[in-house]
């Protein structure tokens, strides 16, 4: 039997055209509060005219409400038809799906407790990123860190900087990002302490220890920052560098050789206040204040957070907050991170926001008005620059504004 090419093509086209376009309904997977706006999105790869949609109770299969008010939206990606499905006026608690024709949404809940546990859920990522001991692996890593570099007198000396968090899917560690994460967690706990539970212990393993899990995570970060600032005027900015980027590996299997032997320790970059390596070039470090300010604000707020749980450590942190602040004041400028293989770094371009937040936080912790006055002055120096995730600008402005008018 012989078939013409044109016949085969026509047959394939007919077959493909008979396959219906993909359609989806996207919902808030956490669910919806009864009194809150409730919107889902219908999307289709083909042309679709949606005129109505229904809300179905999952356990009975009953249609509990019909809607005839879909709002057509712009196309999105390969989705040729997009509609917003508003069902805000339905407030009965329960478990439901939305249906458009034969297309069903995933099930979702309407109820007053849909957000319970979401604050703690975020901490799963922080525990996953832990260095020193990783509760997800239930194994230790990087226990030999590290060797000092860029110090005027201590290059190659050992320093104990275990702990903290890995920055991303690599295993580098930076004060730039870790201090930000620590402060953000403290700020969140300070504003809403009641939303955090106690399900894990201090090591991130299952089992309550009488301390909110977010405070356990905060202390994990503060312990590391404390090690990275072991004495007055001695600050370190990062552990390891992009020589780490040699394939995917679990933290416990990181055996990169930085010059001291495989897996025997990683470089710990001293805050020298001077340019350091950036691939074939040098970074644009001009001082220490951007890092010192981060230390100071974290230590000052950390003293407030930990005083009810670890009072001795809280006392130490408040002393170190003052020391870090004055070290930054005496060494103005930005302290950028370093890289060896490529030119990609955290390109810190501002330091006054860090010092402003540090001054405000020290004012809150000590009540000394001189710190508030200095915070206002740092705010006046603030350049108009783009907000980035590792800068404390928004927090420093907000806190300074809050206290300056009291």
PLM regions and their residue ranges:
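Bacterial N-terminal signal peptides
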Residues: 6-17
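Contiguous beta-strand segments within globular domains
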Residues: 24-46
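Interdomain boundary/hinge segments at the C-termini of tandem beta-sandwich modules
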Residues: 110-112
